């Protein structure tokens, strides 16, 4: 699989691998000492909505897995498929020297790495630890320091694309860490994503993800507002979506993940906003953006408003629905 990926962007200084490019085996010559063809066990901690399909794609590429999740039921299908399931992150670290974590919050990540039964209790020297959670960049930096003390390598590699891209193996990974280890990380991440982008030092992957989700939240709210206004003005929602998507207002929220029920198939709005990326998680990510904006003295006027909207949604019963349910929220809120 790795041989089907090509290193791009050398002239611009941007390093990323894309499976969409033609194969170029020669591009693998500059890898580090880790074997790109290695099929030794890979640890995977956190097999929820995103982690589950990500882990399955590693299985499809022939990697044996060492699985842990705080909810044992989440591990059952992996156990039934013949993968090893263990009882703590420390047990994962004891059995695997390459580990991927996919967890909901900074607190969960800290516990998985530094807790009483965390990875760092039994991590091996030279291990590669990849965190695909979306967490505070400062937490990533602190975890990297702790991992380095143990003689291992930490990289942050949050994702974009949602559950659909996780299932199809088309996620985008934003990677921060030691550049010399990027190729080793890409070996695994390329099994789960179509784009693996090197962003810089530890924490820059998280920074890129926070910026992406800030824009995503704003564009989703904007799409929901525009669609709601058009419907109230008498436009057919499918027609309006078609017009937006051939005009300058087009965005991912309008053409790929439209928030209006009946406009698109295969998206949460077509399933009562079940599945997808939860409103609670979007509110969490916008909180991270708020914190980063405060620490860097960066004005995020629309981002702050988006944060308040998603927090309000969580308080009004939308916490378990997909974040595109902001359309439903706007329709039901007569105060707007």
Swiss-Prot record:
Active site residues of this protein: 209
First and last residues of the transit peptide: 1-36
Pathway(s) where this gene product acts: Amino-acid degradation; L-valine degradation
Binding site for NAD(+): 40-69, 103-104, 108, 134, 284
A cellular-component GO term for this protein: mitochondrion
Top-level taxon: Eukaryota
EC assignment: 1.1.1.31
Keywords: Acetylation, Branched-chain amino acid catabolism, Mitochondrion, NAD, Oxidoreductase, Transit peptide
Catalytic activity: 3-hydroxy-2-methylpropanoate + NAD(+) = 2-methyl-3-oxopropanoate + NADH + H(+)
UniProt-annotated location(s): Mitochondrion
A Pfam match: NAD_binding_2
MF (Gene Ontology): 3-hydroxyisobutyrate dehydrogenase activity; NAD binding; NADP binding
InterPro entries: 6-PGluconate_DH-like_C_sf, 6PGD_dom2, 6PGDH_NADP-bd, HIBADH, HIBADH-like_NADP-bd, HIBADH-related, NAD(P)-bd_dom_sf
N6-acetyllysine: modified positions: 60, 76, 121, 145, 149, 238, 242, 321
Top class in the EC scheme: oxidoreductase
Record-listed N6-succinyllysine modification sites: 60, 76, 95, 141, 149, 238, 242, 297, 321
One GO BP: valine catabolic process
Family per similarity comment: Belongs to the HIBADH-related family. 3-hydroxyisobutyrate dehydrogenase subfamily.
Subunit structure: Homodimer.
PANTHER family per record: 3-HYDROXYISOBUTYRATE DEHYDROGENASE, MITOCHONDRIAL (PTHR22981:SF7), 3-HYDROXYISOBUTYRATE DEHYDROGENASE-RELATED (PTHR22981)
Protein name, per record: 3-hydroxyisobutyrate dehydrogenase, mitochondrial
């Amino acid at each position: 699989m790795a041989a089907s990926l090509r290193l791009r962007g050398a002239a611009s200084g941007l390093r990323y691998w894309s499976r969409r490019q033609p194969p170029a085996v020669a591009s693998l010559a500059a890898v580090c000492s880790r074997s790109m063809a290695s099929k030794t066990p890979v640890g995977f901690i956190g097999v929820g909505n995103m982690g589950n399909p990500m882990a399955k794609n590693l299985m499809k590429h022939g990697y044996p897995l060492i699985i842990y999740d705080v909810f044992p039921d989440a591990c059952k299908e992996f156990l039934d498929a013949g993968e090893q399931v263990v009882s703590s992150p420390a047990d994962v670290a004891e059995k695997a020297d390459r580990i991927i974590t996919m967890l909901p919050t900074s607190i969960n990540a800290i516990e998985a790495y530094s807790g009483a039964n965390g990875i760092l209790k039994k991590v091996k020297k030279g291990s590669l630890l990849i965190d695909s959670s979306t967490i505070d960049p400062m937490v990533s930096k602190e975890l990297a320091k702790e991992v380095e003390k143990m003689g291992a390598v930490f990289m942050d590699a949050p994702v974009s694309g949602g559950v659909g891209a996780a299932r199809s193996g088309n996620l985008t990974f934003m990677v921060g860490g030691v550049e010399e280890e990027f190729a080793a990380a890409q070996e695994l991440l390329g099994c789960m994503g179509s784009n693996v982008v090197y962003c810089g030092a530890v924490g820059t992957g998280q920074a890129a993800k926070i910026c992406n989700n800030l824009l995503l939240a704003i564009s989703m709210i904007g799409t929901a507002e525009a669609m709601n206004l058009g419907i109230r003005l008498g436009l057919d929602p499918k027609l309006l979506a078609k017009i937006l998507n051939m005009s300058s207002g087009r965005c991912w929220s309008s053409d790929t993940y439209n928030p209006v029920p009946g406009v698109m198939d295969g998206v949460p709005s077509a399933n009562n906003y079940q599945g997808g990326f939860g409103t609670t998680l979007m509110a969490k990510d916008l909180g991270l953006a708020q914190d980063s904006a405060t620490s860097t003295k960066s004005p995020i006027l629309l981002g702050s408003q988006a944060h308040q909207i998603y927090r309000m949604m969580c308080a009004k019963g939308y916490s378990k629905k997909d974040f595109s349910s902001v359309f439903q929220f706007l329709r039901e809120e007569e105060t707007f």
